[in-house]
Amino acid sequence: MKNLKLIRVINDYTQLKVQMETGIPQSMISKYEKGDLMPTAENLIILAKFYNTSLDFLMDLTDERTPYPPKSK
């Protein structure tokens, strides 16, 4: 999940900072970023809200960063 690490680095956050803000253990964040573990749906939503970005961006389905939740049409 390259975009998950990318957005963390862009925001100048450490994995520990993300852990403190989201409650997701640093060890899991590391595994998510390396692609060793897929986040649960619940954790994906927590991360999308924290970073204010779409699930598609976090899951590397798009390179276009849009806010979370997506705006209704």
Residue ranges and their predicted role:
Residues 14, 25-28, 40, 54:
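Short coil turns linking two alpha-helices in DNA-binding domains
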Residues 59-73:
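Short, charged recognition helix plus adjacent turn
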Residues 23, 42-57:
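DNA major-groove recognition helix of helix-turn-helix/homeodomain DNA-binding modules
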Residues 2-21, 46, 71-73:
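Short basic helix-loop element that most often maps to the first helix and adjoining turn
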